[in-house]
């Protein structure tokens, strides 16, 4: 019987991941600030015949995260997988952000990942087994305008994870840490993110459904991989940043500004979730079902790499045979 802890599990990707892990036979501990949404997430897990534990807390509180890990091991058993999904953001130009906002985004998105990793690591290393999955973004590699705080925090988490991975390799530890870099996903966060944009925030197209992200997270937990790039926008962003970063600067400067704003004007006085959760009844999906893709061919290819390689070799053999036949 396997146990997984998922932070940020009250809605969006974390909520979809809780269901996906339960479908694979895991008992699931869900962690986030909003107790009501956590109870709903736990009910979905129990409806699938698995045990669930609700852990309402703020991942920026290291002591609370550590105490929660103790509870999980006492009640559900040893933690096999820890998924760091919790994150937050503020939309706006750099000069519009306050020091407090930058601190808060960093605390949740970066320090929350670090605290979750430390809580998992202190339990997994003595057992010499376990997997830590860092839910990241293509923005950890290629930053975009209007989300400087979030991009910086995700890049920091990638640097932290790379260092940890090397330490585990040096010690020949069987504990594994992996990162899943996601594209834009249709989650409820766009309805409650703090924003100073003149128009309502939206995911930068193309957009994917949370179930695509959840499938990638579960696969990364169960298969050895250093990183998993989900969706062609992430792959192109990573490659573009490595090959032609200056060109990418100009591309995102032109495209990402308008692409992150809908045609609807921003609603004045709308509550946001930066400091406190917004009390709304939501699950995994946001309001962009009309444009979100339910699958990713590139993710399928990664998950079936051997079959794809075999098919490619088969096609190559047929082509070589055809050329030889035509020559004769």
Residue ranges and their predicted role:
Residues 170-263:
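SDR active-site lid
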Residues 35, 57-67, 99:
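The beta1-alpha1 cofactor-binding region of Rossmann-like NAD(H)/NADP(H)-dependent oxidoreductases
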Residues 26-40:
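Conserved glycine-rich Rossmann-like NAD(P)H-binding loop of the short-chain dehydrogenase/reductase
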Residues 137:
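Residue(s) in the substrate-gating loop at a strand-loop-helix junction
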Residues 10-12:
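Conserved glycine-rich cofactor-binding loop
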Residues 93-94, 98-103:
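Substrate-binding pocket helix/loop in short-chain dehydrogenase/reductase
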Residues 117, 153:
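Active-site helix of classical SDR
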């Amino acid at each position: 019987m396997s146990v997984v802890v998922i932070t940020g599990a009250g809605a969006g990707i974390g909520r979809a991941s809780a269901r996906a892990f339960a479908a694979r036979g895991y008992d699931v501990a869900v962690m986030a600030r909003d107790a009501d949404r956590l109870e709903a997430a736990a009910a979905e897990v129990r409806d699938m015949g698995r045990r669930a534990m609700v852990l309402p807390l703020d991942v920026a509180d290291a002591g609370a995260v550590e105490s929660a890990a103790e509870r999980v091991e006492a009640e559900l058993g040893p933690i096999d997988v820890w998924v760091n999904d919790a994150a937050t953001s503020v939309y706006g130009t750099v000069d519009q952000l306050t020091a407090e906002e930058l601190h808060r985004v960093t605390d949740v998105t970066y320090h929350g990942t670090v605290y979750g990793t430390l809580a998992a690591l202190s339990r997994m290393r003595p057992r010499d087994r376990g997997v830590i999955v860092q839910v990241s973004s293509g923005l950890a590699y290629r930053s975009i305008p209007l989300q400087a705080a979030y991009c910086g925090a995700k890049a920091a988490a990638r640097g932290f994870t790379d260092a940890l991975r090397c330490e585990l390799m040096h010690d020949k530890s069987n504990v594994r840490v992996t990162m899943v870099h996601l594209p834009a996903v249709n989650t409820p966060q766009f309805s409650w993110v703090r924003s100073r944009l003149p128009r309502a925030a939206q995911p930068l197209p193309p957009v994917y459904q949370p179930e695509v992200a959840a499938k990638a997270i579960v696969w990364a937990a169960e298969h050895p991989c250093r990183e998993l790039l989900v969706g062609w926008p992430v792959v192109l962003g990573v490659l573009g940043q490595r090959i032609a970063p200056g060109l990418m600067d100009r591309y995102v400067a032109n495209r990402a500004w308008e692409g992150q704003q809908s045609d609807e004007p921003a609603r004045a006085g709308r509550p946001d979730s930066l400091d406190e959760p917004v009390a709304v009844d939501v699950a995994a999906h946001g309001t962009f079902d009309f444009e979100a893709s339910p699958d990713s061919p590139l993710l399928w290819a990664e998950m079936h790499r051997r079959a794809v390689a075999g098919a490619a070799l088969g096609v190559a053999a047929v082509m070589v045979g055809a050329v030889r036949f035509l020559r004769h």
